[in-house]
């Protein structure tokens, strides 16, 4: 009997379009000799819509439902995703997806799911909290100032100018895929950058700009996590924003990255240490800055990285000899393993 994968995609965050791309890639790459795929779309308003089922590879004409093609007659209660023995693959990016909220819902339903648990998902989603945890683990961070809604913005700007040097990057603490992030060269640019970031979150990070290469390491496993050789994001734009990353195709990837063996070893070790520090499970992508001065800063952990067949995370593992379909199978097996352990702890 085939194993059922419940594919959750869409979602309420600004990254829902990326989620659809990732989900369509997964549904086409699944080993249909072993799996059946059932898909549920989460609309922008948070409704669950039962969409397609696939017992064999979909045709090129098959497309997943989106906000533009919703069939509201297929709206179901969120708990309708439950199926005995099924594994959920929540291909959801950003808030209300990889921030622990969906993970908590799936644990209430007693369903195995791919990826990090409630704690590690919520922790890694918040940039300020992640920095504090990684600092405690001895991992170097880019200098920053945290600003919370209600703070005296003028005083905080003065703190930024005392502790950091322009240019600086302003980021919502709880957001991903470069949404709401701005680069500021002076105070006149910093004020509107803060206003933009506060549209997406009540906690904002102002980070020192660094002249650096962006290097990424893939992580796979539960308590025996393994890392990939690093890959590099090679940009044709000054700032790797949402449109550059997902829409304009203004980046290329260099896998493996052209860096020394010593730097590779440090990055892989730091990535594995960071994954353990947050209590990670299943998968993550660890993003580093490698400066022109030879400094290595861990920028962030992404607990549900972009998962299209052309995304960095699957390509990093392909370079290590694990194909995209095999990667999906391994993640499903890891989900079942962590579920069994979680259930055993409740006895």
Curated annotation (Swiss-Prot):
Originating organism: Streptococcus pneumoniae (strain Taiwan19F-14)
Keyword terms, alphabetized: ATP-binding, Cell shape, Cell wall biogenesis/degradation, Cytoplasm, Ligase, Magnesium, Manganese, Metal-binding, Nucleotide-binding, Peptidoglycan synthesis
SUPFAM superfamilies: Glutathione synthetase ATP-binding domain-like (SSF56059), PreATP-grasp domain (SSF52440)
Enzyme class name: ligase
Positions bound to Mg(2+) 2: 300, 302
InterPro entries associated with the record: ATP-grasp (IPR011761), ATP_grasp_subdomain_1 (IPR013815), D-Ala_lig_Van_CS (IPR000291), D_ala_D_ala (IPR005905), Dala_Dala_lig_C (IPR011095), Dala_Dala_lig_N (IPR011127), PreATP-grasp_dom_sf (IPR016185)
Positions of the ATP-grasp domain: 131-333
GO molecular function, one term: ATP binding
Organism ancestry: Bacteria, Bacillati, Bacillota, Bacilli, Lactobacillales
The protein's Enzyme Commission number: 6.3.2.4
Co-factor note (free text): Binds 2 magnesium or manganese ions per subunit.
Cross-referenced Gene3D superfamilies: 3.40.50.20, ATP-grasp fold, A domain, ATP-grasp fold, B domain
Encoding gene (name): ddl
PROSITE patterns: ATP_GRASP, DALA_DALA_LIGASE_1, DALA_DALA_LIGASE_2
Catalysed reaction, written as an equation: 2 D-alanine + ATP = D-alanyl-D-alanine + ADP + phosphate + H(+)
UniProt record similarity statement: Belongs to the D-alanine--D-alanine ligase family.
Record GO cellular component, one term: cytosol
Name by which UniProt lists this protein: D-alanine--D-alanine ligase
Pfam families: Dala_Dala_lig_C (PF07478), Dala_Dala_lig_N (PF01820)
Cofactor: Mg(2+); Mn(2+)
Protein role: Cell wall formation.
Pathway: Cell wall biogenesis; peptidoglycan biosynthesis
GO biological process terms held by the UniProt record: cell wall organization; peptidoglycan biosynthetic process; regulation of cell shape
Binding positions (Mg(2+) 1): 287, 300
